[in-house]
UniProtKB/Swiss-Prot annotation:
Role according to the record: One of the essential components for the initiation of protein synthesis. Stabilizes the binding of IF-2 and IF-3 on the 30S subunit to which N-formylmethionyl-tRNA(fMet) subsequently binds. Helps modulate mRNA selection, yielding the 30S pre-initiation complex (PIC). Upon addition of the 50S ribosomal subunit IF-1, IF-2 and IF-3 are released leaving the mature 70S translation initiation complex.
Protein's UniProt keywords contain Repeat: no
NCBIfam families per record: infA
Molecular function in Gene Ontology: ribosome binding; rRNA binding; translation initiation factor activity
CDD domains recorded: S1_IF1
PROSITE patterns: S1_IF1_TYPE
Protein name: Translation initiation factor IF-1
Quaternary structure and partners: Component of the 30S ribosomal translation pre-initiation complex which assembles on the 30S ribosome in the order IF-2 and IF-3, IF-1 and N-formylmethionyl-tRNA(fMet); mRNA recruitment can occur at any time during PIC assembly.
Family statement drawn from the similarity comment of this UniProt entry: Belongs to the IF-1 family.
Keyword Transmembrane helix assigned: no
Transmembrane segments: none
HAMAP family for this protein: IF_1
Gene name of this polypeptide: infA
């Protein structure tokens, strides 16, 4: 996984899929964020379903949006 400087990585679970490859994610601490799939996951056709555990990368500037960078098997 490529790591961005300053990005915050947290674990969560997918609550609901939304249009345009967006997902509502509930983080471990109870917060809900809106996240999209990273380019590499899209490129390799990794499917994300509701209730999947994922790693989300959040920007320190906007903690309500993120990028899904990993799906646990």
């Amino acid at each position: 996984m490529a790591k961005k400087d300053g990005a915050i990585e947290v674990e969560g679970r997918v609550v609901e899929p939304l249009p345009n490859a967006m997902f509502r994610i509930e983080l471990e601490n109870g917060h809900k964020v809106l996240a999209h799939i990273s380019g590499k996951m899209r490129q390799h056709y990794i499917r994300i379903l509701p209730e999947d555990r994922v790693v989300v990368e959040l920007s320190p500037y906007d903690l309500t949006r993120g990028r899904i960078v990993y799906r646990y098997k």
